[in-house]
A protein has these predicted regions:
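N-terminal, polar/charged subdomain of small-to-medium soluble alpha/beta proteins
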Residues: 1-90, 96-108, 112-151
Length: 151
């Protein structure tokens, strides 16, 4: 299992190799990409912030839950932090299983659970302003903690 929160670029090949197993007939990969618009507004860039140790712990819990729930052979969950430009990968999820149906289902579930539960916050930056727009629902936080809002 590969779990990482990092300011470094995410490498899909690393994740694929991490989950590849002889007994796995399928590998599914999801890349979350920074897009140039959101809700009709032009996005300049995004800034992701996290509590890395807590985020990795929660990512591991979610990945372990997926392994059992979907009978996976392995999984990888990687999330970027820091400033990300348009077109860069913010989230990488890879899963492997004996058959493709399990990987499709598990990948979808895993991405949704990571976005819902993992303490990572996203700030959207536009030409005329910025706003923290996402955080984990499970912590009851609508925006980043005060220590992160100043960045």
């Amino acid at each position: 299992m590969l779990i990482r929160v990092t300011p470094e670029r995410l490498n899909p090949e690393e994740a694929i190799e991490a989950v590849r197993r002889d007994e796995a007939g399928a590998v599914d990969v999801f890349l979350g990409i920074v897009r140039n618009t959101n809700k009709g507004r032009a996005v300049d860039h995004l800034v992701y912030d996290a509590y890395p140790s807590m985020a990795e712990k929660t990512m591991r819990e979610v990945a372990e839950e997926a392994l059992e729930r979907f009978d996976l052979t392995d999984s990888a969950v990687l999330h970027r932090t820091g400033r990300l430009e348009i077109g860069e990968t913010s989230l990488l999820v890879a899963v492997s299983a004996g058959h493709r149906a399990a990987t499709f289902e598990a990948g979808h579930w895993l991405v949704n659970e990571v976005k819902r539960r993992v303490p990572v916050w996203k700030k959207e930056v536009w030409a005329d302003g910025e706003e923290w727009i996402e955080g984990p629902e499970s912590l009851g936080m609508e925006r980043a903690p005060a220590t992160m809002r100043g960045s």
